[in-house]
């Protein structure tokens, strides 16, 4: 194949992402291969920057769904530019702030709730009579959701 493409193994090595994860990203439409030479998937070189973009966004706590929505606005044969990143990051700032706020609430409650040993069912936020929190969905609602 031409030199403008790289194998999945080379893409994995260049980005630090396992080949299985790259296939997962491709199945989700986040990256696109341009064919196969033998039985090896090949990618355009711009896939290196797209995968790097995905890794940075994941490190920020963005879901693959959010990342996919952002990348969907870009042509598949182009990497995000500085202007693209500025636009995307502006859209993500409120989501990131929500996560920061939730983590701060959790941090502030750690000393008083987890392992406190108070055994006070009247004031303990972890107490859940009749499993009322179950109506709100799965997970530790009292610690992660201020509305609980």
Curated annotation (Swiss-Prot):
Ranges of residues in domain HTH merR-type: 5-73
InterPro entries xrefs: DNA-bd_dom_put_sf, MerR-type_HTH_dom, MerR_fam, Redox-sen_tscrpt-act_SoxR, Tscrpt_reg_MerR_DNA-bd
DNA-binding residues (ranges): 8-34
UniProt GO molecular function: 2 iron, 2 sulfur cluster binding; DNA binding; DNA-binding transcription factor activity; metal ion binding
A Pfam cross-reference name: MerR
Keyword field: 2Fe-2S, DNA-binding, Iron, Iron-sulfur, Metal-binding, Transcription, Transcription regulation
Binding-site residues for [2Fe-2S] cluster, renumbered to this chain: 113, 116, 118, 124
GO biological process, one term: response to oxidative stress
PANTHER family: REDOX-CYCLING DRUG-SENSING TRANSCRIPTIONAL ACTIVATOR SOXR (PTHR30204), REDOX-SENSITIVE TRANSCRIPTIONAL ACTIVATOR SOXR (PTHR30204:SF0)
NCBIfam families: SoxR
Protein name according to UniProt: HTH-type transcriptional activator SoxR homolog
Gene that specifies this protein: soxR
């Amino acid at each position: 194949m031409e030199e403008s493409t790289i194998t999945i193994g080379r893409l994995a090595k260049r980005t630090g992402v396992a080949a299985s994860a790259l296939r997962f990203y491709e199945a989700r439409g986040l990256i696109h291969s341009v064919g196969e030479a033998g039985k090896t998937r090949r990618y355009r070189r711009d896939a290196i920057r797209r995968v790097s973009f995905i890794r940075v966004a994941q490190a920020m706590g963005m879901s693959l769904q959010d990342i996919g929505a952002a990348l969907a606005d870009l042509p598949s044969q182009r990497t995000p530019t500085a202007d693209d990143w500025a636009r995307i990051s502006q859209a993500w700032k409120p989501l990131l702030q929500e996560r920061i706020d939730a983590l701060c609430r959790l941090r502030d409650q750690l000393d008083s709730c987890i392992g406190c040993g108070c055994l006070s069912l009247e004031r303990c936020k972890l107490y859940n009579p009749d499993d009322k929190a179950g109506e709100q969905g799965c997970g530790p609602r009292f610690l992660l959701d201020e509305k609980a």
